[in-house]
């Protein structure tokens, strides 16, 4: 398998970015639900799970930036769109995903930086990822509305990704089982394309 994308399929780097980011996002959605809905305020586990959530989010951000750079340097294989409508829907959903995989962690980072608690991110226990310096010196009263605005934005974007994910998976399965083309195989390692 080629490292770079070819006319027929994605290369190993693009596949790795796709699947690693997808798994990290799914893990982070689950962690986000867990600490937001099921862990009581004041429970020390809430802080720990929140740190994992933030660490994964920052990892998604870094990997997504690298993925966008890689995509700009390696054009993707041309998809076999059977209709102009499918072409348009595919392009909109892919650009929406690229926007979301960047915007969700960015809004999370800004939200964390504007938190009245002032905690940085303990990046997987290796080091503290610093907050944005723009919020330093602000009082809790000044930070609270900023934090809440970014938190709301973060949650709305996360829900948008949750809604878009089954559409993306459904479209890949539709291509594979209904149209019987190679769209899904192009992103799966170890598959052959006719």
Please report, for each region that a protein language model flagged, where it lies by residue.
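Membrane-embedded alpha-helical bundles that constitute the cytochrome b-like, heme-associated redox core
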Residues: 1-194
């Amino acid at each position: 398998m080629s490292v770079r994308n070819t006319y027929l399929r994605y290369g190993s780097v693009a596949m790795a970015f796709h699947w690693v980011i997808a798994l990290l996002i799914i893990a982070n959605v689950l962690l986000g639900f867990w600490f937001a809905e099921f862990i009581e305020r004041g429970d020390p586990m809430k802080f720990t799970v929140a740190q994992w959530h933030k660490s994964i989010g920052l990892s998604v951000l870094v990997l997504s930036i690298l993925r966008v750079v890689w995509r700009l340097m390696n054009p993707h294989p041309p998809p076999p769109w059977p209709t102009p409508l499918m072409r348009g829907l595919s392009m909109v959903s892919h650009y929406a995903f690229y926007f979301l995989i960047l915007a969700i962690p960015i809004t999370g980072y800004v939200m964390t930086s504007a938190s009245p608690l002032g905690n940085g991110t303990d990046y997987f226990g290796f080091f503290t990822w610093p907050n944005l310096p723009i919020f330093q010196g602000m009082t809790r009263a000044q930070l609270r509305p900023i934090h809440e605005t970014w938190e709301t934005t973060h949650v709305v974007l996360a829900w948008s990704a949750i809604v878009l994910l089954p559409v993306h998976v459904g479209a890949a399965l539709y291509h594979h089982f209904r149209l019987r083309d190679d769209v899904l195989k192009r992103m799966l390692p170890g598959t052959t394309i006719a």
